[in-house]
């Protein structure tokens, strides 16, 4: 499995190709850095070695031709990261997974601010962007992952490196929906002990007449596999901003939840009283008898990316 795009093409480009690599950015920090096009690393250390020191947050994002900047709608604060602007610890790695042709690359390019066209392929397929969500800035490093012919779907290093996973299918392709379910199973097996955000995305929601996967099917799948759900349209840019902002919120919610749980456990190590034990036991019985109600409640919240 590799990131879309290869490194061999850069050496054969002439002066025109090198000029495209130095396309003028539209941010106040000056020109964007040169493109980084590379294969999927064996592990995360190889990825870090492939980049210049301090440049983990300065990959292909922000590289575009003049007039092709695709901003979030007005009212959302965002900026493209400049060289060395963020530390490695402050970057969230997000992997886009899914069958070929479901629109992963289109979603990634919208996030990176790059418009589809003849120049789009030159921009690489790893995108970095800093966005402000709920008044707090976050840097996302988005990988557009694709399957090589005869390759396995998700190698171990891919499973281990993500801070969040976005599994994309097309609502017009039932097979891609089934493949998305397979990917979710693989992730669950690989990271059973990790509470990693996984978001199921039904793309191409604008193609209503060609729909093969209903909203209810997508939502039910998300509930069964314990992940979030959203439908998007890359063609109309519908819900794309909500998707990536939701990724940030899900990462933060899990981070904050772990910190709260640690504090709670540290402060409640004293022995429980008999009344508390009885209450906890009764709570378990009620929970067993309320599975259907819990399933309904979960199905109502699985599309809300602002809650766990």
Curated annotation (Swiss-Prot):
SUPFAM superfamilies: P-loop containing nucleoside triphosphate hydrolases
Reported impact of residue 39 to A: Reduces amplitude of peak Ca(2+) current induced in ventricular and atrial cardiomyocytes by nonselective beta-adrenoreceptor agonist isoproterenol; however, basal electrophysiological properties of Ca(2+) channels did not differ
Any GO MF annotation of the entry: GTPase activity
Subcellular localization: Cell membrane
Comp. bias regions, Gly residues: 1-15
Gene knockout outcome: Mice show increased susceptibility to thoracic transverse aortic constriction (TAC)-induced cardiac hypertrophy. TAC-induced CAMKII phosphorylation in the heart is also significantly increased.
Record keywords: Calmodulin-binding, Cell membrane, GTP-binding, Membrane, Methylation, Nucleotide-binding, Phosphoprotein
Modified residues (Phosphoserine): 26
UniProt-listed Pfam families: Ras (PF00071)
Biased composition (Low complexity): 57-82
Residues that bear Omega-N-methylarginine: 24
GO CC list: plasma membrane; T-tubule
Impact when changing residue 301 to A: Reduces amplitude of peak Ca(2+) current induced in ventricular and atrial cardiomyocytes by nonselective beta-adrenoreceptor agonist isoproterenol; however, basal electrophysiological properties of Ca(2+) channels did not differ
Superkingdom of source: Eukaryota
Chain sites annotated for binding GTP: 98-105, 203-206
Post-translational modification (record): Phosphorylation at Ser-26, Ser-39, Ser-273 and Ser-301 may be involved in regulating inhibition of voltage-gated L-type Ca(2+) channels.
UniProt function note: May regulate basal voltage-dependent L-type Ca(2+) currents and be required for beta-adrenergic augmentation of Ca(2+) influx in cardiomyocytes, thereby regulating increases in heart rate and contractile force. May play an important role in cardiac antiarrhythmia via the strong suppression of voltage-dependent L-type Ca(2+) currents. Regulates voltage-gated L-type calcium channel subunit alpha-1C trafficking to the cell membrane. Inhibits cardiac hypertrophy through the calmodulin-dependent kinase II (CaMKII) pathway. Inhibits phosphorylation and activation of CAMK2D.
Family recorded in the similarity comment: Belongs to the small GTPase superfamily. RGK family.
Binding partners and assembly: Interacts with Calmodulin preferentially in the inactive, GDP-bound form. Interacts with CAMK2D. Interacts with CACNB2; interaction may be involved in beta-adrenergic regulation of heart rate and contractile force. Interaction with CACNB2 regulates the trafficking of CACNA1C to the cell membrane.
Protein name (Swiss-Prot/TrEMBL): GTP-binding protein RAD
């Amino acid at each position: 499995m590799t990131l879309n795009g290869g490194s061999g093409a850069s050496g054969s480009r002439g002066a025109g190709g090198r000029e495209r690599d130095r396309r003028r950015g539209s941010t106040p920090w000056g020109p964007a850095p040169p493109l980084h096009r590379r294969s999927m690393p064996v592990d995360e250390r190889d990825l870090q070695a492939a980049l210049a020191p301090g440049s983990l947050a300065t990959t292909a994002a922000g590289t575009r031709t003049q007039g092709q900047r695709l901003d979030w709608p007005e009212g959302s604060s965002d900026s493209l990261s400049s060289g060395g602007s963020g530390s490695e610890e402050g970057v969230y790695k997000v992997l886009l997974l899914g069958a070929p042709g479901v629109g992963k690359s289109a979603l990634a390019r919208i996030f990176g601010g790059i418009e589809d066209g003849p120049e789009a392929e030159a921009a690489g397929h790893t995108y970095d962007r800093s966005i402000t969500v709920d008044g707090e800035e976050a840097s996302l490093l988005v990988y557009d992952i694709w399957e090589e012919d005869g390759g396995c779907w998700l190698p171990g290093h891919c499973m281990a490196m993500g801070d969040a996973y976005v599994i994309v299918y097309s609502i017009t392709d039932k097979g891609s929906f089934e493949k998305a379910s397979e990917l979710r199973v693989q992730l669950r097996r690989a990271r059973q002990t990790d509470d990693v955000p996984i978001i199921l995305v039904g793309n191409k929601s604008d193609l209503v007449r060609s729909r093969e996967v209903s909203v209810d099917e997508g939502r039910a799948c998300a509930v069964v596999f314990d992940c979030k759900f959203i439908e998007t349209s890359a063609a109309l840019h519908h819900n794309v901003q909500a998707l990536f902002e939701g990724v940030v919120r899900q990462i933060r919610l899990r981070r904050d939840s772990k910190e709260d749980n640690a504090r709670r456990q540290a402060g409640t190590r004293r022995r429980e009283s008999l009344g508390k034990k009885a209450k906890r036991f009764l709570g378990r019985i009620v929970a067993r008898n309320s599975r259907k109600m819990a399933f309904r409640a979960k199905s109502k919240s699985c599309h809300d990316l602002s809650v766990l």
